[in-house]
Amino acid sequence: MTLEMVAARAGVGRQTVSNAINSPELLRPQTLERVRHAIDELGYRPHRAAQALKTRASRLIGYGIRSSSTRVPTPVLDQFLHSLSEAADRAGYRVVLFAVAPGDDELTSYQQLLDEHGADGFVLSGTDRGDRRQGWLHERGVPFVAFGRTWSGKDVGDWVDVDGAAGTSAAVRHLAGLGHRRIGFLGWPKGSGVGDDRARGWQSAMRELGLPTRGRRVASPDDPEQATEAAEKLLATGVTAVVAASDTLALGWYQALRRAGRGPGPEAAVIGFDDSPIAPLLFPSLSSLAQPLDAVGRACMRLLLDRLRDRDRPTEHILLEPELVLRESV
């Protein structure tokens, strides 16, 4: 049941039905009575979202937590959410975390937060190919911003992302500047937006520098043991340096070298991605690409606030570059 159906039954416009629910004092008594009769006749139950999204009375921003997120490590999410929550608090909003049902029920979780709490908007993360959330929210006129690009389909909605390709390209160029010519890439299986983006940066930099790529890209899930097996394949090709799509994958290079009686360093360099809390604690300490998560959180909140103020403004996309943090592993 929708506002449009009530409007058709009452013979009025959609805005008139919205006014009857949110601001009845704006309507003539006869019109208000006609709309209320249609509501009763159809059994329409106004969602709190119909009121909250109009008045922003709830001042709540929803953030759905998926049961598993293999592409967004927990330390990354923790720092991002801290920055996002601080920015929301300064603007007078609260970020509400809610569990997202897996599979086909995922969107139901978003609908429930709209129905039960009237969230003003949503912040998404962990976007990937086939992600239905952006299109679903866009079709319903619900304000949202994503930490992550729209990797497939129509590019809808505002987003902030980190330029993974720029990061891995910078890593390759740094390693090449140290004299490495056989530089491998330890990434995730093909098909992930974030993973393919990071692989693309490695490949483009290698080609621009005239360095061979054939046989020097291996894939593994974000699991240390499987990453070790993949890293051993790279080691067998004679590479002298590796760029990894995550710090977890970089751990596989550490372990593969240790099994071979060696260790990371100038002769077997590695650069990870995410600059997780474990990176400086490893021995030798891990060089890594740090995402500007504080800036991402602030930018996400700014875009969402702008969208709440003006639903019709052009979409805005912000792409930030990671920082190469050098340590002992190179």
Predicted regions and their residues:
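Amphipathic helical "hinge" segments at domain boundaries
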Residues: 44-109, 203
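N-terminal helix-turn-helix DNA-binding module of bacterial transcription factors
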Residues: 1-60
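Short beta->alpha connector loops
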Residues: 101-104, 125-130, 248
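Short beta-strand segments enriched in small/hydrophobic residues
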Residues: 16, 56-70, 174, 182-188
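Active-site-adjacent beta->alpha loops and helix N-cap segments on the catalytic face
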Residues: 131-138
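Residues at secondary-structure transition points
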Residues: 1, 26, 30, 48, ...
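Bacterial carbohydrate/catabolite-sensing allosteric modules
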Residues: 41, 86-91, 138-146, 151-330
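Short acidic/polar active-site loop segments enriched in Thr and Asp
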Residues: 13, 59, 120, 181-183, ...
